[in-house]
Amino acid sequence: MGHTAHNKTKLLNRVKRIRGQVEGLERGLDEGRDCGEVLQLIAAVRGAVNGLMAEVIEEHLREHVASPDLASDERARGADDIAGILRTYLK
């Protein structure tokens, strides 16, 4: 079982909180809130997404790169996977 399946409930709860924050941002824009409030809402969404990403990355590194049970080619593949994902995420 993969680490995302193992932590499914915890990760889904984070996603639901992010959804709520995005809905709050949408309401703020729809209601014409001032730019400072909108920026604060955007920062909250960004922080929540970054937190989710960090949690999944950490577990990926533990399971697919740092696990002592992995062969060196499996570790290299895990490191390559995460490097590509980080490149895409940080664009």
Region locations from a protein language model:
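Solvent-exposed interaction patches of small proteins and small membrane subunits
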Residues: 1-91
